[in-house]
Amino acid sequence: MKGSLYSSKIAEPYAQALIGLAQQQNLTEVFGDNLRSLLTLLQDSPDLSAVLSSPVVKDEDKKSVLRSVLGDGGNGYLLNFLMLLVDKRRIVFLEAICEQYLALLRQFTNTVLAEVTSALKLTDAQKDQVKERVKQLTGAQAVELETKVDGDILGGIVIKVGSQVFDSSLRGQLRRVGLSLGTAL
């Protein structure tokens, strides 16, 4: 159900309710940090996702897992929200709810998500340069980066913000040269 229209339809009201609660309690960034960590954990640990979405695993066991995952650093409101998801049998949509919440948070804080692909791992200084460039291009107040390494681009970077793609990769430049040579003949 990951990424399906059905999943996002169910996740949306929960994410909106959660951001409403976060705004009331002035905890939008705290929830955002907790949900980013939880989302990373869900994506990196297929076992955790399997346990939470399994109909065979008892609800109390799921709650126990969530309590241990959030630990002492987790917010009480957020923990109660997760317990509600277990009770309502909506915990299977947790990943989609986290993604929707983070998208709403980006709208709320005028932050854009930039997906950056590079041939080599970017240094912190390079990430800061990319963030500044994306701010200039988009007019956003802040930039959230998702980075990945792809040796196939040969060099440079590709930045995707929403539906816009800024391709300054060597592969992209070679492709554009090839296209211009093809039309020049």
Curated annotation (Swiss-Prot):
Chief place where the protein resides: membrane
Cellular compartment(s): Cellular thylakoid membrane
Highest taxon listed in the record's lineage: Bacteria
GO biological process, one term: proton motive force-driven ATP synthesis
GO molecular function, one term: proton-transporting ATP synthase activity, rotational mechanism
PANTHER family: ATP SYNTHASE DELTA CHAIN
Protein name as annotated: ATP synthase subunit delta
